[in-house]
Amino acid sequence: MNKKTISIILLIIFLITTILTLANVFLDDTNSQENQTGTLTVDNKTIHYEKAGKCLEVIDGNTIQVYGVGRVQLTQVGSIDNEPNFSQAKNFVSEKCLGKTVYLDIDDKQPKDKYDRTLAIVYTNDTDINKELLNSNLAKVSYFTPSEFKKGEV
């Protein structure tokens, strides 16, 4: 075999290994708590969540893709393209959620929006993501009605 053939074979092996590794990281749910209800303590408050899953993608500052759930809209949080803090909001959500298990307190009165995204307060092990975005002025309150959550309560 010549050097070019060997290089191509090594490149293919490398690409296959990389793809399998990434698939394992994002899709391995042997130790996850996906789609299980439960409780979580955040800021000394006991939180009830309806679903949990690994965050596979951050779409923007208030929308994520969760394994086993689909697209999730952070309820009461507005992060609009081309707004001054849009990039910072997306970066914050990426840092806190991407590749990690997130816990969803789904809005019981309106579980989906008009785009079929699940409406929820999103938690990590120690952070209320919705609340942190608002408290950090990275997003504005965007209220959906009806809602189990009171306006500004997040």
Where are these regions (language model features)?
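Small beta-barrel nucleic-acid-binding modules, primarily SNase/OB-fold domains
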Residues: N2-V154
